[in-house]
Amino acid sequence: MRLTEEQEKIIRHTTGHARVSAVAGSGKTTAMIRRVSHLLQQGVAPDKILVLMFNRSAKVVFAERLHQSLQGTTLRPPAVRTFHSLGLRLVASFTNRQYLPRYRLVTEDFQLEKLAREAMKKYGAEANGDETWISKEGIEGFLLFISRVKSDIASPQEVFAACGFEEQHAYYIHAYKVFESLRHAARIRFYHDLIHEPVMAIQAQKDLADWVADHLDYILVDEYQDINEVQQQLLLYIAGQQAQVMVVGDVDQCIYEWRGAQPKYIVSRFARDFSQPTNYTLSYSFRYGHRLALAANHLISNNRLRDRKLCLAWSTNPDTRITCLPEGEVQPLINILQNWQEKRGLNQAAVLVRIYAQAVPVELALLEHNIPYRLVGSETVFSCSEIRALLGYLRLCQGSLKKTGQDVDHVNHVDHINHADMSTVLAMLTHPHLWLKRDVLQSLAQKILKKPGSAGSLIKKYADEAGSPYLTSRILDLAEIWRKIRRKSPKTRAFTVLNTLIEETDLYAHFLNIFRLLIALVLTKGNNSFFEARQND
């Protein structure tokens, strides 16, 4: 593969720190691999080089490509790690030296949410908190606050102020202290503790800082625009005074500010922490044509905190056409794909969405026109719990909530309950959420499937277990809604059933927070016919 002059300069960088600003598709991974190979060929020992990545998949791909590039030589590849795997090694070392307690690592997200909810309930009881503190939105906000604190080295109070949390959520600060107390009592650490704990330990113990520093001669960091404060501190500590640090990134792709990443790190902070770096640019993209590159330059120029690089399309890139189509009743994508199929296969076409919620109307349009597709990285529209819940309410109206048969009083075993039916009812019980424990919800779902006609009465019986007047009222209201939908004629239009559900619950706000396009989708005239067509599926 022929390298560009810009890539060659990076590969043969001589001394000191370096900052590489790379546009999308500019061959930065190739340049980094060749840079590592160049260092090894110059006689640098592999254990004196460290390559840091931000996620495991990127690390695996880089390590495989590096290994392939060294085949046929006697050169041994250096360590390629993620920041978290590096943190894990430090935690193990600090634990053995008794600088950190020996805790169990918990990686399941639901365990983190469970502890956060427990902490919020405990502090809420002490501080007379209201029901919003333990609502889905309240817990999500609290989890975000925990993540921001763990991505920084500042105090919870300082993080709260710096990140612009609303003053009405100041209770997050005190709930965080309860959360940490519960975590230590349970002797567990979560994924984000793998970096936060060793960095805070190094800050508190100078001998630890001396112990971790100056073991490396070269450190290469990929996707540097994603770095946060606690990771920056870790990089500083392991580099010490000896390592030459080269970072590669694109400030225009800094999209993880919600977890502590900020454009300032690659724009100015790197040069402050790692003095007098040599600046390089990878300005040519090999992914797309001139028109798209030009459009991207014009758009991103509105960002203020960035470098002044321009994205240029490589001269041999195929042309990229840009067409802007207004979104109306008919999904414009359908005509595009139908015309595409006349000359090419669908395996040569792809649809990109900014967030997966935006894929919902696209999926429905493709399904309605029998155009096959494959969704990568997320559940398909009829697999996600929000849509399963809506279809479940339609089936409740039809009297077909239990597909495998009618009400059966004598069924007493879980084995007789269809798994798909169980998933549907659980989705209905959590959209809107009854706020009952998971095992209680599963028990209730089983009872409903045994006797769907009595669903409203079965839900009502759990009102006493709600634990607060607000949740009791919520359960009673939902029980009545289930009864109301069940009493409707099986021939009732899908739009009418769903509209009843939306008008009499907070489902609109619920979905707006977690699935912003869903209600617009349900209430769009063009999609009502689709739901009605699917009602009998």
Summary of predicted features, one role per range:
Residues 1-99, 210, 240, 294-297:
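P-loop NTPase Walker
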Residues 45-58, 78, 222, 248, ...:
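Conserved RecA-like ASCE P-loop NTPase motor core of nucleic-acid helicases/translocases
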Residues 44-48, 69-78, 94-108, 120-134, ...:
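Short, polar/flexible loop-turn hinges at active-site or ligand-entry regions and domain interfaces
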Residues 229-326:
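Conserved RecA-like helicase ATPase core segment
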Residues 1-22, 26, 30-31, 48-50, ...:
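Accessory N-terminal region flanking or inserted into the helicase ATPase core
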Residues 86, 272, 316-320, 343-491:
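ATPase/helicase motor core of nucleic-acid motors
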